[in-house]
């Protein structure tokens, strides 16, 4: 299944806030469709399977990844020691496109993906154009030393100044340089998600 390229606010109305996909908030409170209902009412009427599916979709669309990618990350998380749900979230948070977004270099994960794909971002002074690249501890994230690249990222940094940089990262706004100091923790996810239901979804399918 490919990445979503449709109306973003339509997804927000259906799934709730998706900060990685869009910072906009829909003025409409009902879910999409002719017979749309308030989200709270819809949640009460959902079956256990429907709730698991909803959480899975929230995670996939927020991080803008394909079904195949998410399944691969779930399998990876299951093979590691610890809480599978929290490990899954940490894996997603350590993707390069998400790190760029968390540093404030881009307003959304979607925009961060574009920066990475177009070669604007460096990891340890080397160009990395793979959004899914898994960042490691102490890696340095910076911007290509070209005026167009730096001007673009500076603009994004100014726009995202109200959002704090997570505690596992550090960022120098003047030099546009970030460092991965630690693994992402649950408290900085910024998405209302029940990751255990996501794990259950794949365990039952």
Curated annotation (Swiss-Prot):
Compositionally biased spans, kind Polar residues: 28-42
Domain S4 RNA-binding positions: 94-157
Ribosomal protein in keyword set: yes
Keywords: Chloroplast, Plastid, Ribonucleoprotein, Ribosomal protein, RNA-binding, rRNA-binding
MF GO annotations: rRNA binding; structural constituent of ribosome
Domain of life: Eukaryota
GO BP terms in the entry: ribosomal small subunit biogenesis; translation
Region of interest (Disordered), ranges: 22-42
SMART domains in the record: Ribosomal_S4 (SM01390), S4 (SM00363)
CC annotations in GO: chloroplast; small ribosomal subunit
Family membership noted in the UniProt record: Belongs to the universal ribosomal protein uS4 family.
Quaternary structure and partners: Part of the 30S ribosomal subunit. Contacts protein S5. The interaction surface between S4 and S5 is involved in control of translational fidelity.
Pfam families: Ribosomal_S4, S4
Subcellular location per the Swiss-Prot or TrEMBL entry: Plastid, Chloroplast
Task performed by this protein: One of the primary rRNA binding proteins, it binds directly to 16S rRNA where it nucleates assembly of the body of the 30S subunit.
NCBIfam families named among the record's database cross-references: PRK05327.1, rpsD_bact
Alphabetical list of CDD domains matching this protein: S4 (cd00165)
PANTHER family membership: 30S 40S RIBOSOMAL PROTEIN (PTHR11831), SMALL RIBOSOMAL SUBUNIT PROTEIN US4M (PTHR11831:SF4)
Protein name from the UniProt record: Small ribosomal subunit protein uS4c
Organism of this sequence: Tupiella akineta (Green alga)
């Amino acid at each position: 299944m490919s990445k979503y390229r449709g109306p973003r606010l339509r997804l927000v109305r259906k799934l709730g806030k998706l900060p990685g996909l869009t910072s906009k908030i829909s003025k409409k409170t009902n879910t999409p469709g002719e017979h749309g209902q308030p989200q709270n009412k819809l949640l009460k009427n959902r079956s256990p399977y429907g709730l698991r599916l909803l959480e899975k979709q929230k995670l996939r669309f927020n991080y803008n990844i394909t079904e195949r990618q998410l399944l691969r990350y779930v399998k990876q998380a299951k093979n590691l020691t610890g809480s599978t749900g929290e490990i899954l979230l940490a894996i997603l948070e350590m993707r390069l496109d998400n790190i760029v977004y968390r540093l404030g270099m881009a307003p959304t994960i979607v925009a961060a993906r574009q920066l990475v794909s177009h070669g604007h971002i460096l990891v340890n002074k080397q160009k990395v154009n793979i959004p899914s690249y898994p960042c490691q501890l102490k890696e340095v994230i910076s911007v290509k030393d070209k005026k167009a690249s730096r001007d673009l990222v500076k603009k994004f940094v100014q726009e995202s100044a109200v959002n704090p940089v997570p505690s596992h990262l550090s960022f120098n706004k003047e030099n546009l340089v970030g460092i991965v100091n630690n693994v992402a923790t649950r408290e900085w996810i910024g998405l209302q998600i029940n990751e255990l239901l996501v794990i259950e979804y794949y365990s039952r399918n």
